[in-house]
From Swiss-Prot:
This is Large ribosomal subunit protein bL32. Keywords: Ribonucleoprotein, Ribosomal protein. GO terms for cellular component: large ribosomal subunit. PANTHER family: 50S RIBOSOMAL PROTEIN L32 (PTHR35534), LARGE RIBOSOMAL SUBUNIT PROTEIN BL32 (PTHR35534:SF1). Pfam families: Ribosomal_L32p (PF01783). Belongs to the bacterial ribosomal protein bL32 family. Coiled coil: none annotated. GO terms for molecular function: structural constituent of ribosome.
Length: 60
């Protein structure tokens, strides 16, 4: 059975875990219909359009 040759220091362990649990930023684009910020490949929540197609009606 494999056994580590030396103890892994706590700072090395924390450094490794920091990369695993790193928060990533969400990509944001503008809606071509209304110009509102939205996530790519998602329906715009302000106008209800996905590209040039209306997916749902937005209550005003």
């Amino acid at each position: 059975m494999a056994v580590p040759k030396q103890k892994r220091s706590s700072s090395r362990t924390h450094h490794k875990r920091a990369k695993i649990y790193k928060a990533f930023s969400v990509a944001v684009t503008t809606c071509p219909n209304c110009g509102a910020p939205k996530q790519p490949h998602r329906v715009c929540l302000r106008c209800g359009y996905y590209g040039k197609k209306q997916v749902f009606e937005v209550a005003k």
